[in-house]
């Protein structure tokens, strides 16, 4: 079974509580998603490799550490995943950004893929798939399927809120993909929404339905 990490930092949990509220404005929702993604990034990026580098301070020459230049890619699942990109890019600005577009069929609750735009060397990159919600797991599974078909193998999934059903589905389909989430909620309701959740993240991010 794949690994899941729930990031319980007090700042993340505080901001997530505001994010969930019905009366949080579109502007505030957008800003909070960006901030939470950035804060989660410290844990998500914890295992990036380092290398020695010789530098000169105002006092002396010294050997210090820097990122080893591993190629990274942030891949949002459209459309809601877009809201998490800038927060992570603020930490790793050299990362490439791909896009996987999906929408959910409201009758079957199954994802339908309509766009895949990825860096040409995606198979050589460490990939962070981002989507605010991990509900049924269908979109996450399809996104990882698309990446693996193109040779990708080092993939992590980053979300703000997850449901046990979605976590289980993604772990069973792709046990090699580590999941990072700010909250593991109670369950899905009959419409496939996370309870207590935060509603439709895409609608709330962009102010459209």
Curated annotation (Swiss-Prot):
GO terms for biological process: UMP salvage; uracil salvage. The keyword Magnesium applies. Uracil binds at residues 194, 199-201. Binds 1 Mg(2+) ion per subunit. The magnesium is bound as Mg-PRPP. Its EC number is 2.4.2.9. It catalyses: UMP + diphosphate = 5-phospho-alpha-D-ribose 1-diphosphate + uracil. Keywords: Allosteric enzyme, Glycosyltransferase, GTP-binding, Magnesium, Nucleotide-binding, Transferase. Allosterically activated by GTP. 5-phospho-alpha-D-ribose 1-diphosphate binds at residues 79, 104, 131-139, 200. It comes from the Bacteria. Disulfide bonds: none annotated. Catalyzes the conversion of uracil and 5-phospho-alpha-D-ribose 1-diphosphate (PRPP) to UMP and diphosphate. HAMAP family: Upp_B (MF_01218_B). Belongs to the UPRTase family. This is Uracil phosphoribosyltransferase. It comes from Streptococcus pneumoniae (strain ATCC BAA-255 / R6). The lineage of its organism: Bacteria, Bacillati, Bacillota, Bacilli, Lactobacillales.
């Amino acid at each position: 079974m794949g690994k899941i990490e729930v990031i319980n930092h007090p700042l993340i949990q505080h901001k997530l509580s505001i994010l969930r509220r019905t009366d949080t404005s579109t502007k505030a929702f957008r800003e909070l998603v960006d901030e939470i993604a950035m804060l989660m990034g410290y844990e998500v990026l914890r295992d990036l490799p380092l290398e020695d580098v010789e530098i000169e301070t105002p006092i002396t020459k010294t050997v210090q550490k820097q990122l080893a230049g591993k190629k990274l890619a942030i891949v949002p699942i459209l459309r809601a995943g877009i809201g998490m990109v800038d927060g992570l890019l603020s930490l790793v600005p050299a990362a490439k950004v791909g896009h996987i577009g999906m929408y959910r069929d409201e009758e079957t609750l199954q994802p339908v893929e309509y766009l895949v735009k990825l860096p040409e060397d995606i198979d050589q990159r460490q990939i962070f798939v981002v989507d605010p919600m991990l509900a049924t797991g269908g979109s996450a599974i399809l996104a990882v399927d698309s990446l693996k078909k193109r040779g990708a193998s080092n993939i992590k999934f980053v979300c703000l809120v997850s449901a046990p059903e979605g976590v289980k589905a993604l772990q069973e389909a792709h046990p090699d993909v580590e999941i990072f989430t700010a909250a593991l909620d109670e369950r899905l309701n009959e419409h496939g929404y996370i309870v207590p959740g935060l509603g439709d993240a895409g609608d709330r991010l962009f102010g459209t339905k």
